[in-house]
């Protein structure tokens, strides 16, 4: 369902909200969990490290969405809606990890930060889904101004990667290559998710174990 066209001022406001969504993602879905991953590795906090490792496996779908949107592939808009939902679920789903985190002293900086981050990530997921859902109409009409707003950040990241790739390898990192890698990664992601849903979940339930 395509979003109704808005006046120029509202289109500018919509673009601002899109960029706000990307900035929130960079903070709560990328930057902070990366810091927590390194922090937990340095402190050798096994439960936190395992939670963050599982989170990054799930969060890779957001990177796949960026690759697909770089080349304006319609599927990227759908995965952009699904990704934050799975990411938020991944930090609350595991019963054993939840219990281990509850046992950690609240006054310690790392456990406290992880707990606050999980709530912040959940809030971001709600905002992100609400925003990305408005772009589902772009799966049929990707050339509108609203759709182009969602493509700006992926194309900006693509430009940086293209420059680095050319400098290091002397090759071309094109939008078509990015989309191809995105599709290949998506196939692997879906295969892994199905394997977990059909094989591992029925056997172990909500226990992370050594996953």
Feature-to-residue mapping (PLM):
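Juxtamembrane "helix-exit" motif on the non-cytosolic side of transmembrane helices
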Residues: 39-42, 65-73, 132-137
